[in-house]
């Protein structure tokens, strides 16, 4: 609460303890909030990084409150935290793609594959994300474009702003280990 005092507002919602995390609702809310920022010309990278962090911290706080009150089982906490991470990954990937200068197509042909706690839907508070990145795109520029996307995505997920951080990212599980490419084509 000291680091993110804004989450205290979550306690004013009388339904907070009885609700569960809803990925669709969370992602629609992020889209609405981004549109509101865009309408006033405030949707630069820093604003979006902070928007993601505020939404993430608020949802983790709601999950923690439900956990402390005994409303959720350990498995439900892990499910909700894992679903939150998936939503953050999906949204951040899309936003990074839209902002990528050298993209060669409208929609990416790219996936984030989760291993470890996230892959097993066993994420806990403060867990890192063990993820690898793959693409299926025959364009000759694809390798470079998706490598740029991955660098941007990792930065957006890990950089600490005034609103804090999102996740630590561990990419060591990629096919060739720490020395391998950050992103691999399906054909490789």
Q: Which residues does each PLM region occupy?
A:
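Non-catalytic regulatory/linker segments of enzymes
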Residues: 2-188
């Amino acid at each position: 609460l000291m680091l993110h005092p804004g989450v205290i507002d979550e306690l004013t919602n009388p339904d907070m303890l009885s609700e569960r995390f809803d990925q669709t609702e969370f992602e629609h809310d992020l889209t609405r909030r981004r549109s509101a920022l865009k309408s006033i010309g405030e949707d630069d990278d820093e604003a979006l990084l902070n928007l993601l962090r505020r939404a993430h911290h608020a949802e983790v706080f709601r999950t923690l409150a439900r956990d402390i009150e005994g409303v959720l089982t350990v498995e439900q906490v892990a499910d909700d935290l894992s679903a939150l991470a998936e939503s953050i990954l999906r949204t951040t990937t899309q936003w990074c793609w839209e902002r990528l200068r050298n993209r060669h197509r409208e929609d990416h042909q790219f996936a984030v594959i989760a291993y470890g706690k996230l892959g097993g839907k066993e994420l806990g508070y403060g867990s890192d994300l063990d993820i690898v990145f793959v693409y299926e795109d025959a364009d000759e520029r694809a390798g470079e474009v998706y490598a740029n996307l991955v660098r941007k995505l990792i930065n957006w997920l890990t950089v600490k702003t005034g609103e804090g951080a999102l996740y630590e990212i561990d990419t060591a599980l990629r096919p060739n280990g720490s020395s391998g490419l950050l992103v691999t084509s399906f054909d490789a």
